[in-house]
């Protein structure tokens, strides 16, 4: 790898990291806005609707954004267009699954189905747009596609809350705000439908540094998994992420769900930042695994630093509750701070190594390991439903977070050993 290419990867990673951190700050502001201006029940219902939409979108994508980054032999714009068509068709086929999830959550089918559909398709476009800009976008485009959607959503939620208090309007402010934000993000996918005669300057700069024989000797990271395995991996991840919200709604009610999801929304963004600013950039730039001890240590330091940030955020939330800066109705968040910090901190360590399987041709093993972990997590999550006397929400989350953390740490150790 040439000096120029190293510098370019570093700059791209820095841009994505900074923009992701800015988006993270906006997400925190959005979460604080929900804590101050909305009730736990409103936050809980919004979390259920948005999570079902996320579940639908994730299944429809079937890890297509990751494949779009890993398989660089396909032109970026053509690949994005094909990915959208295939994902949209899968989304339509999964409509009954989304309806089943809504029914299980015990929310009214209408207009919940409409909101879920709109959220799913707009978020699907935004996810593909992020991968597209990583491969074929400028630095400012890579930053804007990450920052503008959450900024739009937070601004809309604030305006909607103020308008609602002034006009006594009780409409779905949070859902509308999220929908507008996702729509702004999906708009960045429009360039995929524009024919481009000339090569993209970003991709051209990389090709200048690559000798003709390098494509044979050093193939870029790829995704060799079958479509069935990718779908199974996606299904396991999406089902678990949605089941957490839906099971909490069913067993413990909207208020308890609001306490859990509000904190999870803040802490859960850090693993996403690590994945976007580190793993995805490494895949998008065709970066190969380095064998030096220093290179191997970098993901550990990155993951540990992110873990420390999760701890700081958890402590900040505890201080806010202790100092009574939040409404007394949010006192129930106390029980979720420690387990969620442990769970999401472990997720940061795992995310720091998530590019390694694709660089070492171990993607199949990675998918099977993630599926196995998801099954173990599901057993812990659904166990109280079959008990004659359900356990308390605090005990349930403690058991689930412990199992998840141990599994994620084991996964991180395995990925760190890949060569």
Region annotations inferred by a language model:
Residues 1-26, 67-68, 192-197, 201-233, ...:
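N-terminal membrane topogenesis motif
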Residues 8-62, 228-255, 265, 401-405:
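Signature of the first transmembrane helix
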Residues 27, 58-77, 263, 267-291, ...:
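Helix-loop junctions and terminal segments of transmembrane helices
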Residues 40, 104-116, 316-348:
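Interfacial segments at transmembrane-helix termini and the short loops linking adjacent helices
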Residues 50-58, 260-280, 310, 340-347:
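Transmembrane helix-bundle signature of multi-pass secondary active exporters and lipid flippases
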Residues 76-92, 224, 290-306:
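Interfacial transmembrane-helix starts/ends
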Residues 113-122, 143-196, 372-377, 390-418:
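Hydrophobic alpha-helical transmembrane segments
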Residues 122-145, 344-370:
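Membrane-interface junctions at transmembrane-helix termini in multi-pass inner-membrane proteins
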């Amino acid at each position: 790898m040439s000096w120029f290419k190293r510098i370019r990867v570093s700059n791209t990673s820095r841009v994505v990291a900074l923009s992701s951190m800015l988006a993270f700050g906006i997400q925190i502001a959005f979460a604080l806005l929900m804590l101050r201006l909305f009730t736990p029940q409103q936050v809980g219902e919004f979390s259920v609707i948005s999570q079902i939409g996320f579940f639908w979108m994730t299944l429809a994508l079937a890890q297509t954004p990751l494949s779009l980054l890993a398989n660089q032999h396909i032109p970026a714009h053509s690949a994005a267009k094909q990915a959208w068509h295939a994902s949209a068709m899968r989304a339509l086929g999964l409509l009954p699954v989304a309806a089943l999830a809504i029914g299980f959550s015990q929310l009214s089918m209408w207009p919940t189905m409409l909101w879920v559909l709109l959220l799913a398709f707009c978020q699907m476009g935004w996810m593909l747009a992020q991968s597209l800009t990583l491969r074929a976008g400028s630095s400012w485009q890579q930053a804007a596609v990450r920052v503008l959607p959450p900024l739009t959503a937070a601004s809309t939620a604030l305006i909607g809350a103020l308008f609602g208090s002034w006009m006594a309007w009780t409409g779905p402010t949070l859902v509308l705000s999220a929908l507008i934000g996702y729509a702004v993000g999906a708009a960045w996918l429009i360039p995929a439908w524009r024919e481009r005669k000339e090569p993209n300057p970003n991709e051209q700069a990389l090709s200048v540094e690559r000798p003709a024989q390098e494509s044979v000797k050093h193939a870029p990271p790829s995704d060799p998994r079958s479509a069935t395995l990718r779908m199974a991996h996606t299904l396991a991840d999406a089902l678990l992420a949605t089941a957490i919200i839906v099971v909490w709604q069913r067993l413990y009610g909207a208020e308890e769900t609001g306490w859990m999801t509000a904190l999870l929304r803040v802490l859960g963004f850090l693993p996403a930042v690590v994945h976007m600013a580190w793993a995805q950039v490494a895949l998008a730039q065709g970066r190969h695994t380095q064998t030096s001890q220093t290179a191997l240590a970098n993901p550990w330091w990155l993951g540990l630093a992110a873990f420390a940030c999760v701890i700081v955020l958890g402590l900040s939330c505890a201080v806010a509750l202790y100092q009574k800066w939040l409404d007394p109705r949010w006192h129930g968040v106390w029980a979720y701070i420690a387990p969620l910090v442990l769970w999401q901190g472990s997720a940061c360590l795992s995310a720091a190594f998530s590019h390694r399987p694709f660089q070492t041709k171990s993607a199949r093993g990675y998918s099977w390991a993630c599926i196995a972990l998801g099954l173990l997590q599901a057993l812990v999550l659904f166990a109280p439903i079959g008990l004659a006397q359900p356990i308390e929400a605090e005990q349930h989350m403690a058991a689930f977070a412990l199992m998840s953390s141990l599994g994620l740490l084991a996964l991180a150790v395995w990925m760190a050993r890949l060569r």
